[in-house]
Amino acid sequence: MSSHIESSLRIKGLLDSRIGGRPDNQDSAGSADTSLGTIVVVCDGMGGCDGGAVASNIAVTTVIDDVSSAVVGESPAEVLKEAIIHANEMIYKKASETSSLNGMGTTLVAVLITKECVYASYVGDSRIYQLRGKKKVFRTFDHSYVYQALVSKGVITEEQARLSSQSNSILKALGVEKTIDPEVYALPYLKGDRLVLCTDGFWGSMPEHDLITSVCHRFDPENALEQTFTKIENIGIVEGGHHDNYSAAIIDLNTESLIRTKMDKRTKILVAILSFCLLTSLVVNVHQCTHEDQPTQESSSNQADTTKQIQQRLQKSQVL
């Protein structure tokens, strides 16, 4: 069942989770409007029996509760990081206390949207995209074997990784180890940017280019999400109907962050060229002005010399 993302900020968003072709849904997702900003979390659980569902639910609930209890003045980045660390501890503790939940864990993607920027963090192979139209401004890099060991070294392409039989071999997850040290990224944003948080059942269903086209700005978040879910379901049915759970949140940012976005390489080059042209034009104009002034000065000097010569001749004539 889809859920609108409530926020006091100028954003519009929707999140949803579907069972796919599996007997149960181990994904979880949630959001809340807090004093620090809007928190959105999407998780993909794993583990026998109900372990995956339990782990993903603990992660979503813990992170949202911890961020919601924070007060204005606390560092959003630190609050988000500590909330994820706490979620890891809670899942690990629960798995240790209940034998049937041994080995459970979950991936996580979370964003804390503030006026200053978007604070983003992830664990595992669920993803965060920041899109500007169809341009990919930011994307998390999966904590998985195929990405960390193969794609990062140029051994295989991202599309080959998506189709690999080892694509589900993840290197990090909440609840698997006793401690975890998540990274938090500060993402400046422009008005019109779109955030997509999703599990691998969502992004792994089709080539990335097709996915970005499907969730791009031609549609509002609700239509974009529904259209993409329909595509994923149809692809899953064609491929045998045993496709994974898939969950996602799509959020439109309808204002600009207080922290300014950095210029990309292409923009920097363009600015440099324009600056050079402007400077060159200025130098040429100054040179021309200086050159035009010189004949005037020379002419004045010649006129002065002529006047002096006339005066001298007059003096001579008077003497004679």
Predicted features by range, described:
Residues 1-320:
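PP2C/PPM-type serine/threonine phosphatase catalytic domain
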